Amino acid sequence: MYVRIVQDLIRELGKLPGIGPKSAQRITFFILQNPSFDIDRLSETLQSVRKQVQFCKVCGNFSEEDECVICSDPRRDRGVICVVEEPKDVVAIEKTREFSGLYHVLGGAISPIDGVGPDDLNIRQLLQRLADGTITEVVLATDPNMEGEATASYIARVISAMRIRVSKLASGLPVGSDLEYADEITLGRALEGRQYIN
């Protein structure tokens, strides 16, 4: 149907999340039919991202430095940490402009079916951050699905003895969805109306 190299490109693009065979084919045809599209720049940018972006040593968010721009910003409220599953959740919450504290990225959620337990997440690092006594509140902003709820419950239970207020996003987020798909207004209201667990 297509020459081998075109099939290879479609197959490789199709490995990206959210890109099915039709989208991969459309992107491939766009690249082939638009000689003004700077494919070299795209390639260089992809390679630069792979080489230069790392995880923040403090919170686990994406960063070009050892500390991300949020952790190194002196204007952030250092008494509140919002716990999220993935860096994309940080982006979603930042878009609301409702949260001015720090973040902690777990790197996923507890999922026994997928073989992911608490030790596979950045929970130990969270507990180390909480141990210094400067944090007064932890906002649990995990996805409103079974794995997210299990993760939030586990973290709330583990830190319950630390005398730190624990809150959870208010309802209003669709159950079973991901934070990244929530609109800014809904997510902002969920932050504003967060419910305290302890």
Curated annotation (Swiss-Prot):
UniProt keyword Chaperone present: no
GO biological process terms on file: DNA recombination; DNA repair
SMART domains: TOPRIM
Keyword Zinc-finger set for record: yes
Origin superkingdom: Bacteria
GO molecular function: DNA binding; zinc ion binding
InterPro entries: DNA_Rcmb_RecR (IPR000093), Rcmb_RecR (IPR023627), Rcmb_RecR_Znf (IPR015967), TOPRIM_dom (IPR006171), TOPRIM_RecR (IPR034137)
Pfam family, one: RecR_HhH
Record-annotated Toprim domain positions: 79-174
Keywords, sorted A to Z: DNA damage, DNA recombination, DNA repair, Metal-binding, Zinc, Zinc-finger
C4-type zinc finger span: 56-71
Matches recorded under PANTHER family: RECOMBINATION PROTEIN RECR
Protein purpose: May play a role in DNA repair. It seems to be involved in an RecBC-independent recombinational process of DNA repair. It may act with RecF and RecO.
Family per similarity comment: Belongs to the RecR family.
HAMAP family found in the cross-reference section: RecR
Full protein name: Recombination protein RecR
Organism field: Tropheryma whipplei (strain Twist) (Whipple's bacillus)
Gene (UniProt): recR
